[in-house]
Amino acid sequence: GRQRHMFKRHRRERADTAKKSRGLFSPMKIIEAVEGALTLPFDEGMALERKLFLQCIDSPQRAGLIHAFFAEREVLKAPETKAAKPRALESAGIVGGGTMGAGIAVAMLDAGLPVTMIERDDTQLARGRANVEKVYDGLIAKGRMTPEAKAAVMARFSGSTSYDALANVDIVVEAVFEEMGVKKAVFAELDRVCKRGAVLATNTSYLDIDEIAESISRPQDVVGLHFFSPANIMKLLEIVVPAKVSADVVATGFELAKKLKKVPVRAGVCDGFIGNRILAVYRQAADHMMEDGASPYEIDAAVRNFGYPMGPFQVSDLAGGDIGWATRKRKAATRDPEARYVQVADRICERGWFGQKTQRGYYLYPEGARTGVPDPEVLAIIDAERVRAGIKPRAFTEEEIMRRYMAAMINEGANVVLQRIALRPLDVDVTFLYGYGFPRHRGGPMKYADTVGLPKVLADIREFAKEDPIFWKPSPLLVELVERGADFASLNQSE
C-alpha cells in the first residue's frame, strides 16, 4: 500500500513538473534518474544516470541555457559604463501613481531608497499610495511579509501634489499618461524644481525621448528607463540613450538597475526601443495568420508549446487591448497604404472588449476569471473580417505558425542590431528572456536563429515574401551574415 501511494504521488509530481518546466527537459531527466535509483540495480541505475547526463550535455537546450547565463552578464558592458562613473543614488522621485508608477515605487522602496510620489491632486495621490500598499498587503496575506516590515518600508514613502517636494532627489522617474504634451509639461516642472545633476528619467514605451530632452534646459540629464509591468516583479529594464545624454547619466541607469536587482539592456531611441519594436512586428505576423485561417487560440497554443508562458492574444488581453488601439490610431495617418492591415483587433475594441479588465477580449473571462475561455463571437468577427478582405481561410500546423512567428521576430531583431538600437544580438536575447517570457532553454530569439541556422530562416522569409513582399523584407544584416557564412553569435563580442 505504501509503495502504491508513493508511485501515485510520484505520478502527480511528474505531471506537475512537466507542466511547470514548459518544454525544458532536464527536470524530467532528473525524475527519470530518481525512478532508476528506486527501481533498478545499482550498476544499471548508474548507467542510466550517465546516459541521461549525456543527453542533457548534447542538447541544444544546454547551449541555450549557457548562452542566457553569459548574455545576462555581458549586457552590463556598455560604452557609457566603461566611460563614466554613476552619479549618487540616495533618493528617488516618481511622477504618477498608476499601476506602473506604483510598481516602480515598490521596486525603489524594496531597494532601500526613500521615495517621493507626485500626483495631480489629493484623490489621485491617495490612489497612488493605495496602489503601493496593495502590493505589500498582498505579501502580508501570503505570509511573506509582516505588518511591521510593511510599516518600516512605508515610512520611507511620501507623497505630494507639489513638484517642489522633488527639489533634492537624485533621480526622478516620470510614469504618466503616454502623450507627448503631458510628458513635456511634467519635464518642464522637473526642470524648474530639481537640483542640478539630478537624473531625469522617462518611462515612456513609444514616444521620442530626444524630443522630451530637447524641450528642457538640461537635455544631458534626460534618459529613458523603460520598466515592464508589473514593475516590482519584471526583471527587465531598458535603458534608452538619447542623443544628448551624458555618459554618467546612462551609467547611473545601470547602477539603478543593479540596486533594483533588475537586468539592464541598453537601447537606442526609436519607436518601441528593442522589445516593443520587435513585438509590433511578430504581433502583426500573428494577426496575418489569424486572418489567413489560424484562430487566435491555435496561435496562442503553438506559442505556449514552444515554451512561452502565454501566447500573444492572451498577453493582449492581460495588458488591455485599449493600449494597442490608441497606438494604432496614433499611427493611422502615417501607415503605408500598401501595407496589410488586419482590423480584427479594432472590431473587438470597438465593442469595448479590452481583455481581462472588461471580462472580454479575444477570450471570455467569466466572473473576472484570470484564465480566459475561447469566445465564439470573436471567431464570428474574424470570419466576417476574412469575408470583407476576400480571404479564403486555410489551416496552419503548429510548426507553420512558429516558423512565421519566429521569422518575423528574428528579422526585426536583425534590423534592430543593424541600426544599433541594440548593441549586439545578445541584447535582443536578454530583452526577450526577461521582458517577454521567451523560453530560457532556447537562449533568446537570436540564439534560436543560430540554432535553426540563418540560411533556413532567410529561406523562410523569402518564401513568405512571395505572398506579402511588403511585410516580409529580409533584413540586410541577415542577408549579409548568410552570404558570409556567419551567425549572430559572431557579433556578440564586446567592443
PLM ranges: what are they?
Residues 1-6:
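Positively charged, low-complexity/disordered segments
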